[in-house]
Amino acid sequence: MEELRDERVNLEVVSSDLVYEGAVWDVRSDTVRYGDGEMTRQYVDHPGAAAVVAIDDDERVVLIQQYRHPIKERDWEIPAGLLDVTGEPPLETAKRELTEEVDLEADRWQHLISMHTTPGGNDEIVHVFLARGLRTVETDYEREHEESDMRVERVLLADVVDGVLAGRLRNGILATGVLAAAEVLRREAATH
């Protein structure tokens, strides 16, 4: 078998209708030719996002906790934000979000992974970056809505991994990003 990877498929789109136009994302209904026939699928048309696993010199991960209405929970997350600035590359979005959400900048950046969050229901792709060499910065960014009472903590990477594996931390972007970061750090340690 060749290198294992997802495969892009370009099907003929017979029709594509905007079913719902939202403030952040839309819902579309596409009919495509597939095999000998056609199929129709509805999905969330999402702008995508960038997220940051920010790890300090003591191997603590910067986490935020905020209310998420669809799940009716205050879940733990890594800093992240929508790719909603035209022409802004994902890395720049990640840098902006790290500053806006937790008043930090980083000296070293590394792309960890890009992932589809729910490919059966939306087209969102999240680009996750590892940030190290953290430093505090002053910002005048005004946090509102869910961000207004956001809690920020630094938690040992090993404890976050334990929380993910035990099912106590269920945010998919946090889980995937932290597990990827832990593996990158493990591989780096093995080569030194």
What is each of the regions a protein language model found here?
Residues 8, 41-46, 51-96, 138, ...:
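Conserved Nudix-box catalytic region and its N-terminal flanking loop in Nudix hydrolases
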Residues 1-21:
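Extreme N-terminal tail/first-helix region
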Residues 15-51, 57:
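Acidic, metal-coordinating catalytic segment for phosphate/diphosphate chemistry
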Residues 27-31, 53, 63, 128-130, ...:
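Conserved hydrophobic/aromatic beta-strand scaffold that supports enzyme active sites
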Residues 28-36, 118-138:
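Active-site-adjacent beta-strand/loop module that shapes the phosphate/pyrophosphate-binding cleft
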Residues 12, 105-112:
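A short coil-to-beta-strand element that immediately follows conserved catalytic motifs
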Residues 2-8, 74, 111, 119-122, ...:
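Nudix hydrolase/Nudix homology domain
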Residues 15-18, 113-118:
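Short, solvent-exposed loop/turn elements at beta->coil junctions and helix N-caps
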